[in-house]
A protein has these predicted regions:
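Active-site regions of enzymes building and remodeling cell-envelope glycoconjugates
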Residues: 43-54
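NAD(P)-binding Rossmann-fold cofactor-contacting core
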Residues: 17, 24-44
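Oxidoreductase and adenylate-handling cofactor-binding alpha/beta cores
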Residues: 124-132
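Rossmann-fold NAD(P) dinucleotide-binding segment
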Residues: 54-63, 71-92
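Rossmann-fold NAD(P)-binding glycine/threonine-rich loop
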Residues: 91-115
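Short, ordered loop/turn segments at secondary-structure junctions
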Residues: 38, 92-95, 120-121
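Short loop/helix-cap segments at secondary-structure boundaries that form the rim of catalytic
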Residues: 39-45, 59, 80
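Glycine-rich adenosine-cofactor-binding loop
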Residues: 5-18
Length: 132
């Protein structure tokens, strides 16, 4: 069975946490980290690329985990990434989730991909917990 090839977009606290988690999964392989910052070193030694280099990884990464902030990053990054990659984000600006969904859904459909948005604690797992 082949491993799921993962890319991480953003390398702050959430990105480093995603990196640590992916490293523990026997069925996943971390391929690349993408950042706006230059001269970053990852904890695992995985190479860091610029955001402009992301499209070079089309077909080489199965899923992008977006680790930017909801206020300014994800609202722009998720639709852009969803055009080329299956992606997951943790968008948590409650009043804008419907707008975010609409934008990301349109981009993913145009690109023939899929996107899972607002997958975090709240909204996300905490919201599901309240249903049951």
């Amino acid at each position: 069975m082949s491993k799921i090839r993962i890319g991480i977009v953003g390398y702050g606290n959430l990105g480093r946490g995603a990196e640590a988690s992916v490293q523990l999964q026997p069925d996943m392989e971390l391929v690349a980290v993408f950042s706006r910052r230059n001269d970053l070193q990852t904890v695992s030694g995985i190479p860091v690329y610029t955001m402009n280099q992301m499209k070079d990884f089309k077909g080489k990464i199965d899923v992008m985990i977006l680790c930017g902030g909801s206020a300014t990053d994800l609202i722009v990054q998720t639709p852009a990434v969803a055009r080329d990659f299956v992606c997951i984000d943790s968008f948590d600006t409650h009043p804008r989730i419907t707008e975010h969904f609409t934008t990301v859904d349109k981009a993913a459909k145009e690109g023939g991909t899929a996107a899972l948005i607002s997958c975090g604690w709240d909204p996300g797992m905490f919201s599901l917990q309240r249903v049951f």
